[in-house]
Amino acid sequence: CKVNQYETQAMEQLLVQTVVTGCTMMINRSLARLACRPVGEGDMLMHDWWLALIAAAMGRAVFLDRATIDYRQHGGNVVGAKDPRSAGYVLQKLKGGAVRRSLVDTARQAGAFLSCYRQELTPDQQALLADYAAAPEKGKLARLTLYRRRGLWKHGLNRRIGQILWW
């Protein structure tokens, strides 16, 4: 999907989906210092995602609209970029509750981020993180209301449908 440069800079967007590729990131000393805090095992889903959250919450995340490397995925990549339009991707996500598990993981990451950086966050950011972290415990209507009210939508039709139907 085509990524909107303004959405990539918003904490709301970065809570639900990473759009950052670590090997293309540049960070400054302030961000590096903030990133050196201990985080519980399994609470930080990906280091580049975590760094983007810190930048969006306490500074700025800037989108560069040009390729800086030739990225290709090798057969042995465990994560790597996936194509959400492919049938294989959709089937893999539907099997065994993967969509829900993925969304619950992002909520857990939001709670860990709040715990780690509460003192540096604005009251609105604290409320956003607390609301999103608590989302797995809420009913579907309450979660959808939160997404709509806070703009917590994933990029791409397939991802958004998965977010609506399976969480």
Model-derived regions: residue spans:
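C-terminal subregions of glycosyltransferases and related glycan-biosynthesis enzymes
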Residues: 37, 44, 50, 72-167
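Conserved nucleotide-sugar donor-binding catalytic segment
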Residues: 4-82
